[in-house]
């Protein structure tokens, strides 16, 4: 079952009732991150005891520019940016971290060419974060002590790769 964007309480309640009756429901809601969806639903007036069992997973996504394949070249980044990238990547779940050599990071940029009209970028790529519901997140929702930060913290603890981490992983490819 597919519901267009959820913008109000009436649409949210219909979607939640469908999910609670066993239908797999896909929809969209505007937030800055996957963890922002839960506080957004609650701010609309959705009751926590209905929301918690209705959710299976939440996906956050953004489209970012892709470096042009024709004029790509390695970029030397500042020590500050490198330290920030390492700090973000160091927080990856262990399963993902084993694929990254933090001591050998290479970043790229496009210098601009005819193919990309001198921009250095051509096309877009999605960066994502996905968290699945677990008992801890459900308990936080039911306690009504919900913040985007608390949900994000629990999702990361449960193995979620954040959009920033996914973006850095894709930049390293």
Segments from the language model and where they lie:
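Short, flexible helix-loop junctions that flank or precede catalytic/ligand sites
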Residues: 2-173
